[in-house]
Amino acid sequence: MKKIKPDVQKIKAYLPHREVEKKPGTLTRALYDIGLAVWFGGSVFGILAMNPAVEVLDDPEERGKMVDEGWARFQPYGAVGLGLATVAHFLMRARPPKKQTDTYKTVALLKDFFIIGAGVTSVASLALGEYAVDDYAPVESATEGTDETPEDVEKAQSGLSIASIAQLACGIGVLVTGAILASERSKSS
């Protein structure tokens, strides 16, 4: 008896099928989450806890030294964390849901803005922070000078306050838009 070899491609054409959506991989998502946690967690701690806590030190020059050393130790980790989160974010953006809602499209653009803003404000904070506590200038805290603080350092501290608030706002924006996108992605599956 002659064996009949089925034409698999023809058979597949007649069967109902659903194309599988390519979602971001687990590794990409994990790198994004870890990177964002390191950057944002460290930034929140530094801005809201460490910067004002140096006021307990009696010597204003020691305050400047403590702030400078604390941020110098965190900056490489924060930069790597934000870098990982940014790369992973754009990798995930390359795999949007098949059926994108208008909400998804709008919020995805907003998240792009916030993640780029996080990078810009982090660089601004880094630059102003380096200048504000340069040579361990006497300070009250990272963002407040003393009577002995040079005027140019006080101006840098003022800019650092603004950059720090913007940095936290961008971080919150990234987290909120990320939650909305995850919800929208699950609706489209």
Predicted regions and their residues:
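Short amphipathic, positively biased membrane-proximal segments
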Residues: M1-S189
